[in-house]
Amino acid sequence: MKTSQWIDISQPLNNDIATWPGDTPFSYEVSWSKENSGSVNVGKLTMSIHTGTHIDAPFHFDNDGKKVLDLDIQVYVGPARIIDVSNLESIGKKELENFHLEGVERLLLRTSSHGKANEFPDVIPHLRADIAAFLSEKGIRLIGVDVPSVDPLDDKELAAHHQLFKHGIHILENVVLDHVVDGDYELIALPLALTDADGSPVRAVIRPI
């Protein structure tokens, strides 16, 4: 039996990728070339943790919150379900009630609202705070979205961020889902082992189950 191929659902990181307005631009350069070193090329990377496909740790929005290395890495590996929630301004309990989510631990939402990694969106569909308790009741431990944030871009309260982690639900942002169909997959989206960080870039991949 042929094993299903892994599918990349990450935004490629390059010097053209969009960043949050005012945040650190992404930059990669060869700072020590083979010609200079005599043996190797050595690259230098500068970026915000919240550029491209990434996870949030509670420390991102709570000074007393857990940091990346405190998070349970088991959450970022395992079965996941992709569902389509396109053409919605916001997503909460009401919009998900008709989906079969029993037994789902990781849920990825396709909004198809913004597919340009090199342009930061002006507005995005966001999650309403009431989604957190609903997802928790279903046993979901991770929510993934194909936009830069689970909250509105100009929001300062970050109600969805706070409520999701209050209910034990981890956040994965900026996944790329327009090239995959709805259904069940195995997900790997492991954060780097960053001791004091408020988030981490990830290489998110899926394969059909």
Curated annotation (Swiss-Prot):
Recorded metabolic or biological pathway in which this protein acts: Amino-acid degradation; L-tryptophan degradation via kynurenine pathway; L-kynurenine from L-tryptophan: step 2/2
Cofactor dependence: Zn(2+)
Broad class of enzyme this protein falls into: hydrolase
Annotated positions binding substrate: W20
Sites where the protein binds Zn(2+) 2: D56, H161, E173
Superkingdom field: Bacteria
Binding site for Zn(2+) 1: H50, H54, D56, E173
Residues forming the catalytic site: H60 (proton donor/acceptor)
NCBIfam families given in the database record: trp_arylform (TIGR03035)
HAMAP family: KynB
The protein's name: Kynurenine formamidase
Species per Swiss-Prot/TrEMBL record: Bacillus mycoides (strain KBAB4) (Bacillus weihenstephanensis)
Lineage: Bacteria, Bacillati, Bacillota, Bacilli, Bacillales
